Amino acid sequence: MNDVFSTAQHKLDALGLRCPEPVMMVRKTVRQMAQGETLLIIADDPATTRDIPSFCEFMDHTLIASETMQTPYQYLIKKGL
């Protein structure tokens, strides 16, 4: 695991879930987090490579890092406002 991903304050395992479940779980988890906290998302649905970055942009969260060259995919996001 890359060092940047190990800094996450929260972790969400979305392995085995298919669209739209991963993004719905991310949204629910982020709602319970404080502004500025980070979330590591681990997923294997190819749709997350498009959906997670779009979710972050739409909801004003920051996509700090992503690893999508191999599964499981990893995303590190920081909660915005």
Curated annotation (Swiss-Prot):
One of its GO terms (biological process) is tRNA wobble position uridine thiolation. Keywords: Cytoplasm. It is found in: Cytoplasm. One of its GO terms (cellular component) is cytoplasm. It comes from the Bacteria. Its main location: cytoplasm. The keyword Nucleotidyltransferase does not apply. GO terms for molecular function: sulfur carrier activity. InterPro entries: Sulphur_carrier_TusA, TusA-like, TusA-like_sf. Sulfur carrier protein which probably makes part of a sulfur-relay system. Belongs to the sulfur carrier protein TusA family. This is Sulfur carrier protein TusA. It comes from Shewanella oneidensis (strain ATCC 700550 / JCM 31522 / CIP 106686 / LMG 19005 / NCIMB 14063 / MR-1). The gene is tusA.
